[in-house]
């Protein structure tokens, strides 16, 4: 069995880890960095850039550079959270045929968020393969604990498009707890994992216990907000800068994608700087121009001002902590340790808010950028048998049930139920003689079905006609270890049954996924061919240069016929290098090598002939030389 790699697929950055010698290890990417920006860009010449390369060119290519797409994955275009982002990103968010939120390039090519995420996963996969020296096909990928079924399915689809068999979807706070607690001694304890990342927020209350020599990680409760993270903090800074500039210059920079991208980079840098300093300056020369000439943005930002701008966002993260503790039946004093995960937790105000709520300082010995990937690798190690004596008991973050008469949401599996799990409930018909029922599967906490997330609808037909209330329809829910749901409905009298693995109305169809897998595979083949073409061109360029140097140096020593053949072959190769036909370039290179060989041989023969003549002359002179006799001279005596 090959390695099962662990991937933290983040909103802002992603991280890769493996198990080596029984311990987790973060793997550096090709740029030597331990995290990779979750950014994908499409260039004018059709090249796809991922990570740091995509981030570097974002300012000059804002409409084709996609970041923070994790906030769109598994979501509908009409969702309030998606609508909020429409005017705040320089790229276009569009509606797919099934109502999902997709993105579009400047030339109107529509892309699913899963496709963008798959590009990041492909880079992670390639990084692992380069490090391990073997093919990698299996992975454990993390998601926010509060991701619903659609978002989990979409993340698995992204893995599939990238050529990865996703062995397990694991919640980010749980992964961080695994990374933190695996080697810790000190008996049973309860910990809180506060995970404020680039685009999502989770909090999980987890009990770590020794049970029969096995370390058990049991999630007691989880809560969160899948649209709260560092991106929202950045946006507050961007809004402030835009408003200040508008007051000063009367120009709204929100309408300029290029300016918006520069502002995003500057806002992120300023926010990071203010975690370690009290004041910073945002200086963006030539941010825009009007009839009077170019305009420059220069605004001072203090830590106090930043904290005022994001105060409500920080407070918004505390309420889920209160709910999670309540769901776990615990008080803050019952929590022994608080772990901070996610880059946004480096902000002093966030750390202070967490310390104030839990009544204790959060631990600083956990790397907030790497803990989640390390935990995913540990889970991969457990599945592969490389890590022993670890049991992970996770929970479903939201209640699951069906719509019943009157639009009521009837829960079958309550939130924070340990998974995997199964539950059944018996229902009946609402009308006399009813021969079929529609099962509408939902996820959420509202009493009214219409306010919860619709996951699927399916029909159970062939029910024997009977007065209302008599037929016995057993609806069973089965959640696997990935938190993905399977539902069945069975008529207990006729034993007719309908089963479905819940595939939300949102999400990609199998044919769409297969097409994207094929596209990704074709792109990998395309990249390989591109590399081969570049190598052929580089070899040809070197050959052209060395041949021209040989003509210049030795051309006079060989016949004009040889030079003519070489020049003709050179011209053919130079023409081939301008094209994209690798085989043509290689063939013309081979021809030039063969033709130029006579030039090199003639030049070598000329050299040897010259050195032979020089040797004979030297030898004659040597014979005339008389060896001198030397006497040692001591002092003045000669």
Curated annotation (Swiss-Prot):
GO terms for molecular function, please? ATP binding; ATP-dependent protein folding chaperone; unfolded protein binding
In this UniProt entry, the residues modified to Phosphothreonine are: 200
Annotated keywords:
ATP-binding, Chaperone, Nucleotide-binding, Phosphoprotein, Stress response
Region described as Disordered: 601-624
According to the lineage, what is the superkingdom?
Bacteria
What is known about its induction?
A: By stress conditions e.g. heat shock.
SUPFAM superfamilies in alphabetical order = Actin-like ATPase domain, Heat shock protein 70kD (HSP70), peptide-binding domain
Question: What is stated as this protein's family in its record?
Answer: Belongs to the heat shock protein 70 family.
Looking up HAMAP family in the UniProt record yields: DnaK
Role this protein plays:
Acts as a chaperone.
Q: What is this protein called?
A: Chaperone protein DnaK
Q: Which gene encodes it?
A: dnaK
């Amino acid at each position: 069995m090959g390695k099962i790699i662990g991937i933290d697929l983040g909103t802002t950055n992603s991280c890769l880890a493996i198990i080596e010698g029984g311990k987790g290890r973060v793997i550096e990417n090709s740029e030597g960095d331990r995290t990779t920006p979750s950014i994908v860009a499409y260039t004018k010449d059709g090249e796809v850039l991922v990570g740091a390369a995509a981030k570097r060119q974002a300012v000059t290519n804002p409409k084709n550079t996609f970041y923070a797409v994790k906030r769109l994955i598994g979501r509908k275009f009409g969702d309030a959270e998606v609508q909020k982002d429409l005017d705040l990103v320089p790229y276009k968010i569009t509606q797919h045929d099934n109502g999902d939120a997709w993105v579009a390039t400047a030339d109107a090519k529509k892309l699913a968020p899963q496709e963008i995420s798959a590009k990041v996963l492909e880079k992670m996969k390639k990084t692992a393969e380069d490090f391990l020296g073997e093919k990698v096909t299996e992975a454990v990928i993390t998601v926010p604990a509060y991701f619903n079924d659609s978002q989990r399915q979409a993340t698995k689809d992204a893995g599939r498009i990238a050529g990865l068999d996703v062995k397990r979807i694991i919640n980010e706070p749980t992964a961080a707890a695994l990374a933190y607690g695996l080697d810790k001694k000190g008996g049973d304890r309860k910990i809180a994992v506060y995970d404020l990342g680039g685009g999502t927020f989770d909090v999980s209350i987890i009990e770590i216990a020794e049970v029969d020599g096995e370390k058990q990680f049991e999630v007691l409760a989880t809560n969160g907000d899948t649209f709260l993270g560092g991106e929202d903090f950045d946006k507050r800074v961007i809004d402030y800068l835009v408003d200040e500039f508008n007051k000063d210059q009367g120009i709204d920079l929100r309408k300029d994608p290029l300016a918006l991208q520069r502002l995003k980079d500057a806002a992120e840098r300023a926010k990071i700087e203010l975690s370690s300093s009290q004041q910073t300056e945002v200086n963006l020369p030539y941010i825009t121009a009007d009839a009077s000439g170019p305009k420059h943005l220069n605004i001072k930002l203090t830590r106090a001002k930043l904290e005022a701008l994001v105060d409500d966002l920080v407070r918004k993260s505390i309420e889920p902590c209160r709910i999670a503790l309540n769901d776990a039946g615990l008080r803050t004093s019952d929590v022994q340790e608080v772990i901070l995960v996610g880059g946004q937790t480096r902000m002093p105000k966030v750390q202070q808010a967490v310390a104030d709520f839990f009544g204790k300082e959060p631990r600083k010995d956990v790397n907030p950028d790497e803990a989640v990937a390390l935990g995913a690798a540990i889970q991969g190690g457990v599945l592969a048998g490389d890590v022993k004596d670890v049991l992970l008991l996770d929970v479903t973050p939201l209640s699951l049930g069906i719509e019943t008469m009157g639009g009521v949401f009837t829960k079958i599996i309550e939130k924070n139920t340990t998974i995997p799990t199964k539950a059944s409930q018996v229902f009946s018909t609402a009308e006399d003689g009813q021969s079929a029922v529609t099962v509408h599967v939902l996820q959420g906490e509202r009493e009214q079905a219409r306010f919860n997330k619709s996951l699927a609808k399916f029909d159970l037909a062939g029910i024997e006609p009977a007065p209302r209330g008599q037929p016995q329809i057993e609806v069973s829910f089965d959640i696997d270890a990935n938190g993905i749901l399977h539902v069945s409905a069975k008529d207990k009298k006729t034993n007719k049954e309908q089963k479905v693995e819940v595939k939300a109305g949102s999400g990609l169809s199998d044919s769409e996924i297969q097409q994207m897998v094929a596209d990704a595979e074709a792109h990998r083949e395309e990249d390989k061919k591109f590399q081969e073409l570049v190598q052929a061109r580089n070899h040809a360029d070197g050959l052209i240069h060395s041949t021209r140097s040989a003509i210049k140096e030795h051309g006079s020593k060989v016949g004009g016929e040889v030079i003519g053949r070489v020049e003709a072959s050179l011209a053919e190769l130079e023409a081939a290098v301008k094209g994209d036909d690798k085989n043509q370039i290689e063939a013309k290179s081979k021809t030039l090598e063969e033709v130029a060989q006579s030039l090199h041989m003639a030049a070598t023969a000329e050299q040897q002939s010259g050195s032979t003549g020089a040797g004979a002359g030297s030898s004659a002179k040597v014979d005339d030389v008389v060896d001198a006799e030397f006497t040692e001279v001591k002092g003045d005596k000669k």
